[in-house]
A protein has these predicted regions:
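Conserved catalytic core of two-metal-ion nucleotidyltransferases
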Residues: 34-38, 42, 48, 86-139
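Short, well-ordered alpha-helical packing segments
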Residues: 74-77, 90-98, 197-200, 229-232
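N-terminal regions immediately upstream of nucleotidyltransferase
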Residues: 1-52, 70, 176-177
């Protein structure tokens, strides 16, 4: 796996001059990195015999398939039988991740705990909009998708929109100082990556579409839409 990642990163560095002129190609590179990690984690998860009880999910940038070399690997593991004692193999799986020198952020939750946390914390709920299932039994995944759909119905669109709007205002106040104007934070500053994510999250929740590419409501003119799609592919 590490050899595959090294080859992808080497390819990226070799193509860097080309990518600087046409940065949309970065998207292909990020997808390659994500697929390598997907395959390795899914394989190890299944080999550890965890798929019958647990569901392995990617969230955050990993869930969005935006896995940069320095990105954390954010995981949520759904326990479909939380009344039982956690399996030792689950600890072994987490230890294996650390042994690979990955920067891992993970949580292990039951579906009911996940729903409760998400209803009370819209930041946590937002992370579920980028969730991507990596491994688990077909039966458990079907049940999980059903539970996730039920959760989405309980979160009101207007409440979510207002939350993201207020969140953006607070972020602008924090990252729009003279210091950040001189050296912008390309993730959090106004007009940067987090704004694109916010557009995507609002589209997913309020317009019920899974990609800004599917926007067909005359919200943006042709030029604005082209710019937005290019920024989304470039990932800033």
């Amino acid at each position: 796996m590490h050899k595959s990642l090294e080859l992808i990163d080497e390819e990226f560095l070799n193509d860097l001059k080309i990518l600087q002129k046409n940065p949309i190609g970065v998207d292909k590179y990020l997808n390659k990195r994500t697929r390598v990690i997907d395959k390795a984690l899914s394989k190890r998860f299944s080999e550890n015999g965890l798929s019958s009880r647990y569901i392995l999910c990617a969230i955050g940038g990993f869930g969005r398939e935006e896995l940069f070399p320095a990105s954390d690997i954010d995981l949520t593991i759904i326990d479909q039988d939380p009344k039982k004692k956690p399996e030792e193999e689950l600890n072994n799986f987490i230890s294996w991740l650390w042994d690979q020198n990955f920067k891992v952020g993970h949580s292990v939750r039951s579906v009911s705990a996940m729903q409760k946390i998400a209803r009370n914390d819209l930041q946590e709920y937002t992370s579920l909009l980028s969730i991507r299932v990596l491994s688990g039994s077909k039966k458990n995944i079907t049940a999980f998708n059903r539970d996730l759909k039920a959760l989405h119905k309980k979160i009101r669109k207007k409440v979510f929109f207002n939350f993201k709007e207020n969140e953006a205002i607070e972020r602008y106040q924090k990252f729009n100082s003279t210091e950040f104007n001189l050296e912008p934070d390309i993730k959090e500053s106004p007009g940067c990556l987090r704004d694109i994510h916010s557009v995507e999250w609002i589209c997913q929740k309020c317009l019920e579409i899974d990609s800004i590419k599917k926007l067909k409501m005359d919200i943006f003119n042709r030029s604005e839409m082209k710019s937005l799609l290019n920024l989304s592919l470039i990932h800033i």
